[in-house]
Amino acid sequence: MKTTQKTLLAAAVAALAAPGTWAQTGPVPTQTLRQTTVTGSTIDDRFGDSTREPTSTVSLSGREIEAQHADNLVQVLKAIPGVTIDTQGGDDLKIKFRGVENQRYMGEKPGVAIVIDGVPVFERTGKVNINLDNIESIKVIKGGASYLFGEDALAGAVIITTKRGATNKGVSVETDVGAYGYQRELARIGRASDNWSGHLQLSQRKADDYHFQSNYKSQALAGNLRWLLNGHSDLTLGLEKEDRFRDKHGTVTGVTQAALDPRGTLGRDYARHFDVDLERVNLTYSNDLSDRTNLLALAYQYRDHTQFWSAPQRFSSTGAPVSSPDAYTTFNDYHQTQRGVKSELRTTTGPMAWMGGVEFKRNEYLNKTHAMVGYRNSPSPMERPTAAGTVFTDDRTGENEQALYGEGQWRLATDWTLTGNLRHDRIELDYDAKPVSGNRNSAIAERKSFDANSARLGLSWSGLANTVLFGNISTGFRAPTVDQLYRGSQSPSGSVANNPDLKTEQAINFEVGMRKTFTLMDREASLQTAVFQIDRKDFILDTNGQYSNGNAAHVARYENIGGARSRGLELALQSSISPAWSWDLAYTYLDSTFTQYDQFLLAQGNPRGTLVGTGACAGPNPNWNNCYQLV
């Protein structure tokens, strides 16, 4: 079956790549190939051209977004097939494409890169906070996109351009109200002249929400200033500062709870009371060195300071039961700083064009957790209580990333364009933890590096009026996290060991599709459809299984357990029935499954050896590290 699928895909791409199959009989007229330009960029979306793009893409303008009066990004992206979103209240969400990571719902990365004004933004939990009031445009790229955006673009990327330019001049005041106490206010002032344009914007959103304890509020200050240095170069400064608060997740789990407890008043979320402070500053330089050559450069800094509660308290320090919805044991304090510079040079030479880029990133993550109250994990008098103020974690993770990437486009014939991309990433991790209670007062210092290559080869044909046929093969990758590599050192009292030998996850995407615009009932309409398959290998998962607990008899660790596959069909149709009314239809057929799943916890024993007691089980909390060894 696997060979047949690849053969059919190769035949489809070969058919698209054969101009002779579309040619008329008789003499072939002389054709002059039009000049082509590279469309790919990790810095600026200005070079996009849907007639030559060999990948499924969807673009939304700021005008389209504002016309929806959406209160979160879910309502904006719901018309795009293949997109699923985990919402956590307000604008805090996790975006997923084509079934990749749909089976996960906690703190894992989503396999989708999020880029705002060229700045790659992400949170440790895989979620992203997006200011809906500061969006000029959104571009969605589906399929492996690491060839441009690097790590974790297994299934695609979302590129957001914030508001800028002379269109924001003047004074604007807006307000919206809605159900469950939803309110939105916005005030903006802008100026523009021949040499510069700029604006400042203050916005606020808040709501009580339908679900219990799911109120949220966000306040944001955003601005953009653009200088025209001369007739062919400009400098753009973008900034955004946002304060967010969100209480519970604003969801219920399963059909039973939805029927019996639709507002989620029973039980307690594992984490709540999120305070998030975000800051983003980016400076972009653009220079048209000639009518065929452009230089782009970007420097940026992105900060995320998040504090929240976790682990509901079950028993007091004396062992008495605790059921208050506000009783939690752990305070989490997380600082994230991302800094980077990158530059791209692109040029055109008739029917050929290319772009070369270089990127340097330095990310730092500081994580500290401590006990908010004194507590016990059980009512047993033998259970040693945890004192208020006990420090569980105090660590730092550093990431150094360097990348070289490029794109080439060749106009093979009048209507045929071949696109190729290559990227190489070098990722260096350094992890340091102070000696605290959570790691049994042992200092930790670990170093690890990974190298990864990504590519895309695509073909597009625009020989029919208002129609583009396209096909591509692209790849994506994800590097192991510090938590997966060194879980045993982070939590030696647990049952998960270190595995510093993990390999990067890989994904390969196959896709064939069509874009078309036409007239439907005297109205302009657009259609896009694609068939796709994403094959993943070296999938990383805890050998205990997903969200399951281990024990001393089974020494678990994260492994490259096997592979997964997502395949399907996407169709999007959009049109209008009047100037004031529009409609859209989005359909997705998706089949996702594990193609290989190496099960380590077999009934006949541990595959790595036999666990033998060491007799060194001292202390109140014995664990596999000091109680057992493999022989």
Model-flagged regions — what are they?
Residues 73-76, 95-96, 112-115, 128, ...:
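N-terminal periplasmic accessory domains that precede
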Residues 74-119:
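Extracytoplasmic beta-strand/coil segments of soluble accessory domains associated
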Residues 177-206, 211-249, 271-294, 348-350, ...:
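Transmembrane beta-barrel wall of Gram-negative outer-membrane proteins
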Residues 34-68, 93-95, 112:
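N-terminal periplasmic "start-of-domain" segments of outer-membrane beta-barrel proteins
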